A protein has these predicted regions:
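N-terminal glycine-rich phosphate/adenylate-binding segment common to multiple enzyme folds
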Residues: 51-145, 236
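Buried hydrophobic positions in well-ordered alpha/beta secondary-structure cores of metabolic enzymes
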Residues: 12-15, 71, 122, 162, ...
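Glycine-rich phosphate/diphosphate-binding loop of Rossmann-like nucleotide-binding domains
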Residues: 7-24, 29, 140-213, 227
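Glycine-rich phosphate-binding loop
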Residues: 64-82, 204-237
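Short acidic, glycine/serine/threonine-rich loops at helix termini
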Residues: 19, 85-87, 131-136, 185-190, ...
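N-terminal beta-loop-helix "entrance" segment that forms/cooperates
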Residues: 34-60, 217-219
Length: 237
């Protein structure tokens, strides 16, 4: 790209405070590119919780159009209303942004050299429990039902992202994190889908699996985590 447009979306609460300092850093590091017109920092307006509540839209149409004109989005935290709060019970704006822009991979690196930790997490970012937002079913006052959705194409593409990263960065294993011993269909299919991608296209990379509760409880256990490098997991985990 000859010119990169970075959309600036401060968000709610402490978001504008964080963004102010983030922009100080970005403007300093990219001052030459900004001066040369190769980088534009473009504010995106209309996305505060007050704006969204007034319009009754978690992701206003005009905001989405502004975002689509950008190459990169620098975003602060945005309020997702919870039952009992002053705001309407709207769907998460974060989730809608991800789905609208098809941002299916949340990539989270973790590096703690003194503990020999060099991990990269690939979280599927669109499906799972997040896919239906507030469209669950309140059967009675005592019974509510929400949904978990996991598709084969959704699993395959996040798996490919994880394996491609592993191969390009000299990693030798990918670990799948699920609760497939209990959530046997959605999580079971996710586990098998990742294994299939690995077996068919990345036979040089070892596939392991861990249960999400055990992984969380023992992330500080060097024996349990020894040798782990790249992780792939469904949305909620």
């Amino acid at each position: 790209l000859e010119r990169i447009v970075v959309g600036i979306l401060p968000g709610d609460g402490i978001g504008p405070i964080i963004m102010k300092q983030a922009l100080r850093v970005l403007e300093f590091l990219a001052k030459d590119e900004i001066a040369a017109g190769k980088l534009e920092l473009r504010p995106v307006s209309g996305m505060t919780i007050e704006d969204r509540a007034r319009l009754g839209q978690s992701l206003p149409d005009n905001v989405l159009e502004q975002v689509k004109q950008c190459d990169v989005l620098l975003k602060g935290p945005m309020v997702t209303p919870r039952p009992g709060e002053e705001w309407p019970n709207m769907v998460s704006a974060n989730s809608l942004l991800r789905r609208s822009l098809d941002l299916f991979a949340a990539v989270r690196p973790v590096s703690i050299p003194e503990k020999n930790i060099d991990w990269t997490f690939f979280r599927e970012n669109i499906e799972g429990e997040y896919i239906w937002g507030n469209k669950g079913i309140q059967v009675t006052n005592d019974l509510a039902v929400d949904f978990k959705v996991q598709t084969a194409p959704g699993t395959e593409r996040i798996a490919r992202q994880a394996f491609e990263f592993a191969r390009k960065n000299g990693k030798t294993n990918v670990t799948v994190i699920t609760k497939s011993n209990i959530v046997k269909l959605a999580d079971g299919n996710f586990l098998q889908g990742v294994r299939k991608v690995g077996a068919e296209h990345y036979p040089d990379i070892e596939v392991q699996d861990r249960l999400v509760d055990a992984m969380c409880a023992r992330m500080g256990d060097e024996t349990f985590c020894k040798g782990l490098q790249v992780f792939v997991l469904p949305n909620l985990y």
